[in-house]
Amino acid sequence: MFFRIVRTLPLILAAIAASSGSGLYAQTAPVRVAIIGLEHGHVTGFLHAFPLQHDAELVGIVDPSAALRAKYEAEYHLDPALFYPTLDALLAERHPEALLVYTSIGEHRRIIEEAAAHNLDVMVEKPLTISLDDALAIRRAAREHHIQVMVNYETTWYASNRAVYDMLQQGRLGEVRKVVIHDGHQGPKEIGVQPEFLQWLTDPAQNGAGALYDFGCYGADLMTWFMHGAAPITVTAVTQTDKPQIYPRVDDDATIILRYSGAQAVLMPSWNWTFGRKDTEVYGTKGEVVAVNSTQLRERFSESSPEESVTAPPLPAPEDTSLHYLAAVVRHQLDPGHDLTSLDTNVVVVQILDAARESARTGRTVTLRPLP
């Protein structure tokens, strides 16, 4: 099952009502959320989506930069009273139930540990963090304080990826043999990301690497989900910088090979694609499927049959958007378990990325050890 939903009659009725458009979720008090950080460009997506939903109430925004606070206040016509320079100042007055983190990836551990001390659930942008040591520290804090830590990926909300997962679960593809995942775009500078976003994306101390971490995490997340949380046996990676004049400190192209018992995944994160892409190919013993984009699939089940194009069914609420999902988790209506956003899945993702970075550095294949 994609997400494990608590099996009680009221919650089943709520899910049915939400999917039918009756607005029952909207009648529940919205979850009080605060934004931490404005230096991650994905915050704009939240601010655009926020007025169109009823699951979350924005009660505060924290960023130490007065210039960034003023920029977003003006651009989104936000109440100046929402803005705070520190998390402590916000917590003293606003009492959020959950935090949405839009800082550099390198700041995630510190913020999650602070949130855990206040028993606040957290959703961060992908990836979870920049090193396995940090990921394990985050897991310790979450377990000690009994909080949920979720990782938001655009591809989690792709109906096509859910359809691929369901095909695997139903056995329609047979046993998985090879998965090829392409993620990336022309480059952050080339597509015009905000200056504050570009500054830390190209700093290995804050982003972990370049394209290797920025887009390698998508494929690692999907493959870990497809493999029911299992880590690969080995990780082999090659990175290069094809545009050193733009990205002198980090890689802009990578290939990562994950070896499992009986299967292999090839992840191709890059800041050098001709166009933006997030597509996945899965090859099994009975069939193959390509998730072309967020909704479209190409599938084929025998050598003699032609490839067919199909549209994936839409995701049901509350599995359809990040805020809908977050609200359900905070309300204890949904348990992330070992799914795409879950902490357990994403500790494995960081284990893969950490090993890939080491493999690229040394030129050697890295054998993974069991997590503590």
Positions of the model-derived regions?
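N-terminal Rossmann-like dinucleotide-binding module
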Residues: 24-77
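Conserved SAM-binding strand-loop segment of SAM-dependent methyltransferases
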Residues: 80-86
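Active-site loop of classical SDR/Rossmann-like NAD(P)-dependent oxidoreductases
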Residues: 41, 291, 312-324
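Beta-strand-loop-alpha-helix segment that lines the small-molecule cofactor/substrate pocket
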Residues: 98, 104-105, 109-156, 171
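Predominantly a Rossmann-like dinucleotide-binding segment in NAD(P)-dependent oxidoreductases
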Residues: 156-246, 363
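C-terminal helix-rich "cap/oligomerization" subdomain common to oxidoreductases
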Residues: 28, 98-100, 328-372
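Bacterial N-terminal signal peptides
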Residues: 8-20
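Contiguous beta-strand/loop segments that form the cofactor/metal-binding neighborhood of enzyme cores
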Residues: 219-296, 323-335, 355-356, 372
